[in-house]
């Protein structure tokens, strides 16, 4: 299955000129397909997604400056459930994302890197191979950056130079035990896949449209409602349908969760 479902690497840097963040504050706008979008008072629209082997929901957040990383920092042995982090941050919605220490099912510490409001709260980019940063810079543009092999000092310099505001890490790894991947769409170019690109699993992904709106997608799988889950191909198709210029996988499996109050 792994050999039948692979993907080519994506090395292009994001072209920020393709994103022009809208200053429109209306709760009703027209999307890329000419359809009227109705946002709630928080500037959020929820969409239900149905695929061949998954069901999902997407949050479309009109103002990308409202999307931030929430964590349990300062780090400890035990983490929190997503709804606790969302409520603690005074937010109305959230999804999971990024790598964390899963041994013992305690989830108190991240893996790789974490940036919150411009501050690096976890800095170990060389602890795992194949790491990517997924986050937003201070201009509220989605960033998907290969940080494989960076030292902690290199990463600190990169965060300062690139103006990274909030970010987590996920991993590119194709093996018998893992089928992890990160870039899905870069500069309107979809990742080239062999087969479906990956197996089917619950997934969490992020994208950004040309108008700056953020797309947060979570799908089910692993037998939930009889669904196997979403493949890399599925994620790309959904993100393209909803106008993503750039998109990346954030996490998957039993961690995939969405909260929306």
Q: PLM features: residue spans?
A:
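Short acidic-glycine loop/turn motifs at beta-strand connectors
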Residues: 62-65, 135-141, 186-187, 208-212, ...
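Domain-core and long-helix interface of multi-subunit machines
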Residues: 169-170, 174-241
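Exported/periplasmic cell-wall-interacting domains
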Residues: 228-230, 236-261
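Short, conserved catalytic/metal-binding motifs centered on acidic residues
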Residues: 94, 206, 251
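Zymogen propeptides
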Residues: 1-145
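Short, solvent-exposed aromatic-acidic interface loops
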Residues: 72-78, 148-152, 219-223
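Active-site-adjacent helix-turn-beta-strand microarchitecture at beta-sheet edges
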Residues: 101-196
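Solvent-exposed loop/turn segments at secondary-structure junctions
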Residues: 65-66, 99-103, 141, 212, ...
């Amino acid at each position: 299955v792994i050999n039948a479902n692979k993907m080519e690497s994506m090395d292009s840097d994001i072209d920020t000129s393709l994103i022009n963040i809208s200053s429109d504050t209306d709760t009703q706008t027209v999307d890329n397909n000419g359809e009227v979008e109705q946002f709630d008072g928080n500037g959020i629209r929820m969409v239900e997604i149905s695929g061949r082997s998954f069901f999902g929901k997407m949050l479309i957040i009109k103002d990308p400056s409202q999307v931030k990383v929430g964590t349990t920092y300062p780090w400890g042995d035990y983490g929190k459930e997503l709804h606790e982090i969302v409520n603690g941050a005074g937010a109305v919605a959230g999804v999971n994302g990024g790598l964390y220490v899963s041994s013992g099912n305690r989830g108190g510490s991240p893996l790789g890197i974490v940036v919150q409001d411009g501050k690096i709260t976890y800095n170990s980019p060389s602890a795992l191979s194949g790491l990517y940063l997924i986050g937003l810079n201070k201009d509220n543009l989605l960033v998907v950056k290969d940080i494989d092999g960076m030292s902690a000092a290199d990463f600190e310099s990169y965060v300062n130079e690139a103006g990274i505001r909030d970010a987590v890490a996920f991993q590119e790894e194709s093996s018998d035990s893992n089928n992890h991947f990160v870039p899905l769409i870069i500069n309107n170019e979809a990742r080239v896949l062999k087969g479906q690109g990956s197996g089917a699993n619950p997934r969490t992904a992020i994208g950004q449209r040309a108008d700056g709106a953020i797309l947060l997608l979570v799908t089910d799988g692993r037998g939930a409602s009889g669904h196997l889950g979403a493949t890399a191909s599925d994620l790309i198709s959904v993100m393209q349908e909803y106008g993503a210029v750039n998109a990346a996988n954030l996490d998957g499996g039993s961690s995939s969760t969405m909260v929306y109050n």
